[in-house]
């Protein structure tokens, strides 16, 4: 419920928002959360008429783990097979992604200098954990037909390395995908000052207004 406050800037701009819950790592291992988010997107499309959603302007957004899920939801194609358990046969198309300091390369967090305990727990002791990590890593889905992507990341983030954002946006540039990376100087894993938040949301809405269909 605390995350509902993150929706307020969008509501103030006249957006309709859906707050998505997903299975956490202490309930279900990867790729359950990714599957849940893909199914939630399909639910939005299926219920668009009832709630007045504009399916031509669907934006997915999240912070931290939610940032990773926003990226995977907007980037993973149906042929990857991670939406097979979802109800319905809708083919949702995301119009833009807003990624707040999300993971972009899961394998990077499983081994070596960037190893993070939360990533190790999320993958668990599954025998195919490396393959699953590849399947849920946004950097592996970069291609030219992706929606516009904007990321916000602090360059002193101790939880998700800032290099994850740099790596993703370099790949997006090479694929000629519309994208923007907002760097928060000395920013850690969220908790940015009010003046930075005003700057960030101004940039987000400018990016969306410029790149979404009218």
What is the predicted function of each stretch?
Residues 1-18:
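Short amphipathic alpha-helix adjacent to the substrate-entry channel of hydrolases
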Residues 16, 21-25, 103, 185-187:
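Short beta-to-alpha linker loops that shape the active-site pocket of alpha/beta-hydrolase fold enzymes
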Residues 39-111:
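Primarily recognizes the serine-hydrolase "nucleophile elbow" in alpha/beta-hydrolase
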Residues 108-141, 147:
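Mobile cap/lid helix-loop segments that gate and shape the active-site cleft of serine hydrolases
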Residues 106, 156-160, 191:
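Acidic catalytic loop of the alpha/beta-hydrolase fold
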Residues 145, 150-153, 157:
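Short beta-strand/loop motif that positions the catalytic acidic residue
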Residues 11, 114-128, 156-180, 184:
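Active-site-adjacent alpha-helix of alpha/beta-hydrolase-fold enzymes
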Residues 152, 162-214:
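C-terminal catalytic histidine-bearing segment of alpha/beta-hydrolase fold enzymes
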């Amino acid at each position: 419920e605390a995350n509902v406050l993150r929706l307020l800037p969008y509501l103030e701009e006249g957006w309709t928002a859906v707050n998505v819950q997903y299975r956490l790592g202490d309930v279900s291992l990867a790729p359950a959360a990714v599957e849940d988010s893909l199914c939630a997107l399909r639910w939005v499309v299926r219920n668009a008429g009832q709630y007045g959603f504009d399916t031509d302007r669907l934006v997915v957004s999240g912070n931290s783990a939610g940032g990773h899920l926003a990226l995977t939801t907007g980037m993973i194609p149906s042929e990857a097979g991670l939406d097979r358990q979802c109800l319905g046969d809708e083919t949702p198309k995301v119009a833009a992604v807003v990624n707040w300091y999300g993971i972009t390369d899961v394998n990077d967090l499983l081994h070596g200098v960037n190893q993070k305990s939360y990533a190790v727990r999320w993958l668990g002791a599954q025998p195919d954990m490396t393959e699953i990590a590849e399947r849920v890593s946004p950097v592996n889905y970069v291609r030219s037909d992706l929606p516009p992507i904007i990321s916000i990341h602090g360059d002193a983030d101790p939880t998700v390395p800032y290099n994850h954002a740099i790596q993703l946006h370099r790949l997006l540039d090479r694929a000629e995908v519309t994208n923007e990376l907002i760097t928060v100087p000395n920013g850690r894993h969220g908790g940015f000052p009010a003046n930075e938040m005003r700057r960030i949301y101004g940039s987000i809405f400018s990016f969306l207004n410029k790149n979404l269909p009218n």
